[in-house]
Structure formats: C-alpha cells, structure tokens
C-alpha cells in the first residue's frame, strides 16, 4: 500500500489568506526546477491528482494549504459572461445549466475528466493546474529509484524520453484547459501582493517541470468566460478507457457564426505537448465549414502537434488523433 507522507494541513477562509500562507511557508522562494520533491508547501483542493502524486513521493510538501473552507470557493455566477470560482467541482461545472446551454465544450470537457467519484471531488482550479504527465514520472518511488529517476524529480538526470533534450517533456493532459482556451477564458490569480487577470493560455509554458507561468505563491481564484452569444463549441478526446483515462489527445473547437458563415474560430489541443496548444484557426473564417476548410484547419493542428513517446499511444497515433478529432469536432459544429 502506498501511504501519504506526513504533512501539516492549514485551512484559510479567504483567497488572500491562502496566498499569504503560501508565502509564509516559503512558496515564493521555492523553485520546482530543483525537482518536484523539493517544494515545501502546496495548495490542495479536491486532491484527486495531488494525493496520488504524494503517495508516489513525486511531491513531499511539509505543509498543504487547503482551499476547502475558502468562502465562495465554489460559486458559479452569471453576468455578461460566466465566472467560475476555482473550488467549483468538475461535476458542478459539467452540470451547471448555463455551462451546458452556452459553453458546451466546457460541459463536455469537465464531464469527461476521470470518473464520477473523482469529478465530485476534483475542482476546476485543480484541473487548470494539473501536473504534467509522463510514463517515466508517474510511477512509484520504488520504480523510479530502480530506473535512476528522471529530470522532473532529479534535474541532474537526463530526460528519459529524449536524453539530449535540455528540458522536461512531460505532457499537459488537462481536459478543461483547451475547452476554456477555445471559449476565450481569462483567469484571475492572487498572491500576497494582489490580484491580476490573465488570458488563460498565458498561464502555461512549454516546460514539463515549470509548466505554470505563475509563481509558486500564486493562487488561481477563478476563471471567467465571455458572453457566448453566436458561438458553438465542442470538446472531443481519445483515451485508452473511455470511462476513466487522461486524453491521449483532446481537441476543443469553438466557432462564431453569422448565419452559416464563420466569423471567428478558436481551436486548442491537449495531450500533445508540455502545454496546451492554441492553434491558429483563421483558415476557418469566412467559410461555411466546408470539408476543405475543415481539412485545412485539421492540417494546421496536425503540424502543430509534437507528441513524444511518454504517455499512452504511439507518437503517430496521437498526432493522427489530433487531426481526426479536429475534423470530427468541426463537423459536429457544422451539423449542429
């Protein structure tokens, strides 16, 4: 049996208090590039990804800052668009009437994460911050010790996937992120110095270790979606087991229509790089989603997908899946 390491749990009641506790316990000074086990303090919401990682000793924080008692952490509120607090569970997001009616891609993505039990615990904020994955990293401590570790936990070791690579190639696998990028979402982040808003795509960088482009003392507070009038969206994914697994490749697409003509379009892909890939979808603008326009957009996705041999599926399978699932997504939007 894999057991959790010892840690101390602190339970703030406000976002500001949570950010302050992170800084007080050394988050700002910590550097995950020194190896994931070196991080002294971490946030926990649902814990559906963090606790298994801790059991495998991928992380061994001395302090966990729980968001479970933060006031308003699970609110979903309508305005000109939609604001979702980071503590809202994936089930709450997937079944919210406004999400299912106006933001279909998000409802589909949130509903495609793992199993119902884990969606009842896992949060939208946790999915945004989901750790990158790799077959060399997501193993027990015993397994990794026998193999000599990898760059993500021990930076002095080469990347086992590509030994000549100067960076970790672990893959981004969150389902909700491409959906939110395709929907034009912004994220609110807070630290001890205050709050700021970012385009969601700015939250990530192409690095399997330091995959978040925010500080270790930053807290994701909420995600805000713009008004979806005139937009259609969808999310589709390929995975080993259709009831449980992370995406081998996942594609979110959103188009704004004037009649049947596309006036704006966004496509984002997960599971094919260390960050979610926002794809240039301008080839769709001005079209009526004819087959040749869809094929052109799918070709852009195919060329921009650069999976490595580090998760389920072969490289060619994942790259082809990105193309095929883009075509499926766009056809479903055309025929809706």
What are these regions (language model features)?
Residues 1-336:
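C-terminal structural segment of proteins
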């Amino acid at each position: 049996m894999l057991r959790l390491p010892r840690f101390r749990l602190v339970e703030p009641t406000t976002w500001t208090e949570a950010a302050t506790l992170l800084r007080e316990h050394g988050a700002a000074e910590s550097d995950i590039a020194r190896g994931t086990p070196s991080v002294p303090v971490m946030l926990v919401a649902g814990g559906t990804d963090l606790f298994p990682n801790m059991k495998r000793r991928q992380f061994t924080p001395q302090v966990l800052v729980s968001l479970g008692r933060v006031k308003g952490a699970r609110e979903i509120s309508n305005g000109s668009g939609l604001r979702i607090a980071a503590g809202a569970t994936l089930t709450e997001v997937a079944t919210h009437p406004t999400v299912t009616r106006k933001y279909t891609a998000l409802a589909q993505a949130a509903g495609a994460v793992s199993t119902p039990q884990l969606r009842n615990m896992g949060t939208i904020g946790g999915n945004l911050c989901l750790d990158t994955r790799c077959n060399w990293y997501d193993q027990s401590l015993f397994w990794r010790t026998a193999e000599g570790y990898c760059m993500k936990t021990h930076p002095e070791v080469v990347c086992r996937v590509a030994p000549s690579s100067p960076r970790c190639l672990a893959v981004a696998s969150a389902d909700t992120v491409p959906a939110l990028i395709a929907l034009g979402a912004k994220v609110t982040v807070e630290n001890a110095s205050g709050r700021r808003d970012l385009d969601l795509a700015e939250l990530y960088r192409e690095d399997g270790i330091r995959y978040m482009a925010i500080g270790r003392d930053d807290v994701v507070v909420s995600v805000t979606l713009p008004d979806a009038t005139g937009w259609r969206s969808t999310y589709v994914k390929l995975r080993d087991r259709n009831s449980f697994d992370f995406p081998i490749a996942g594609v979110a697409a959103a188009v704004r229509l004037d009649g049947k003509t596309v006036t704006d379009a966004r496509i984002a892909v997960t599971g094919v790089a260390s960050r979610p890939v926002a794809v240039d979808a301008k080839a769709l603008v001005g079209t009526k989603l004819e087959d040749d326009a869809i094929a052109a957009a799918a070709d852009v996705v195919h060329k921009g997908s650069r999976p490595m041999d580090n998760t389920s599926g072969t490289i060619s399978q994942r790259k082809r899946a990105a193309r095929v699932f883009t075509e499926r997504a766009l056809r479903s939007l055309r025929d809706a």
